[in-house]
Amino acid sequence: MKNLLYKELKLCVPLQTWIFIFLSITIMIPSWPSLVSFFYPLAGITVVFTLSNANRDLLYTSTLPLRKKDAVKGKVLLISFLEMISMLVSLPFGFLKLFLQKGLPEEQIYPELGFNLALYGFVFLVFGVFNLICFPWYYKKPEAKVTLPFLISDLVTILLISFIMAVFILFPEFASYVNSYELPNLLTQIAILLGGLLSFLGFTFLANHLAQTNFQKVDI
């Protein structure tokens, strides 16, 4: 699988996607909602599938000594890898956000999810939902236009992000709670992080299984 992931990275990830992946650094903007920074990587992932279709990547992969389900697994690994990269890249810039916020007047800092462990739990959830929608749908007709599966996936994740953001903006006490590192608050952050991680793993595993099932029915 390492070789397959390497092949995916070399042939299916254009410069535009890397730019979108690294836009998670916008988390450093003090007045910018932290969770929004992780929508950009998902927007860039669409380009991966567009390029794959343009290059007839599925046809090429089918000539390799691989099972059809391994071709799906390779793409799932690639997208999951890119999602993890976007999270890792954001970490130092999240700390920079906290530093920059210290110099702002209190009235310029509005209640939001902020930068903490809970944030990444929700990011895991958002990424998992995206994977669960887009992979099974895409692999029903992988060589058709890829617009609709990713348009719907992006729309659902935007709605999910908006809902999560709205909760913390409308209920400032929630924002204050998750941005505190006292023991009960920290335990809540850890619980949200673990819950999000389990959701991501479960949704992505299910997405991979459903996508493999759909792809087995496709005649390349």
Pin down the residues of each PLM region.
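Juxtamembrane/interface alpha-helical elements of multi-pass membrane proteins
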Residues: 60-62
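Hydrophobic alpha-helical transmembrane segments of membrane proteins
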Residues: 1-58, 75-220
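Alpha-helix N-cap/helix-start motif at helix boundaries, enriched for small hydrophobics
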Residues: 70-72
